[in-house]
Amino acid sequence: MAWNFGNILDTIIPVLPEGHLALVHGDREITWAEMGRRSNNLGRFMLENGASIGDKVGFYMRNRPEYMETLAACFRARLTHVNVNYRYVADEVHYIFDNSDAAVVVYGKEFRENVEILRPRLPNVKLWIEVGDGANLPADTYDYENLATSGKGENLKVAREGGDLLFLYTGGTTGMPKGVMWEHDALRETQTMALRALGDVPETLDELKAH
């Protein structure tokens, strides 16, 4: 089985202790099991409603649990994360989503005004998903929480590859932001090289499960 972050999540979540926390944000606490179910539900929804393997997913949010859940959903559904600095103005956000050919955009409700400016300029975006309270959603927009909690949370039956991609856009200090493409197995190997200096590290998913 390939070293892919989706496979890693599928491997470790079932063997973690009940109640083991994955995300803590203020008063919110989300266990690994909860994040696993929610990310599977979200990933399945995207694949069943217009997104295809390898499609880009634009993240237009502040740091919050939904960001990490959506990232996990992308890993598990073989979709490609595209980051954007939430401080960007509409034209800058448009550049990144257009340049990356984003097919899905997940955004925080506080950015709705900018998103409404962007929609007509991004005709190739198939799904708009809003993270908020679900109130007064714009037309053709899905409520994140409803998607994350709808379904059984079962693992996706997707054959992943180590060459699946993760996009990280640069800050654009020497021009416009550039989309740096990381393969899952290359990013994992970079992390593992540093960890080897501290001792033995798992070399297979089976070793990881037993670690």
Label the model's feature ranges.
Residues 10-11, 47, 65-84, 93-94, ...:
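Hydrophobic alpha-helical segments in the ANL/AMP-binding
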Residues 150-171, 175-176, 202-211:
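Conserved pre-ATP/AMP-binding loop-to-beta segment of ANL
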Residues 21-64, 68-72, 89-94:
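Conserved AMP-binding/adenylate-forming core of the ANL superfamily
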Residues 48-49, 76-149:
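Structural core segment of the AMP-binding/adenylate-forming
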Residues 31-33, 165-193, 198-203:
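Conserved AMP-binding A3 loop
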Residues 1-3, 136-164:
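Flexible, low-complexity linker/hinge segments
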Residues 9-31, 136:
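AMP-dependent adenylate-forming
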Residues 57, 74, 105, 170-173:
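Conserved S/T- and glycine-rich ATP-binding loop of Class I adenylate-forming
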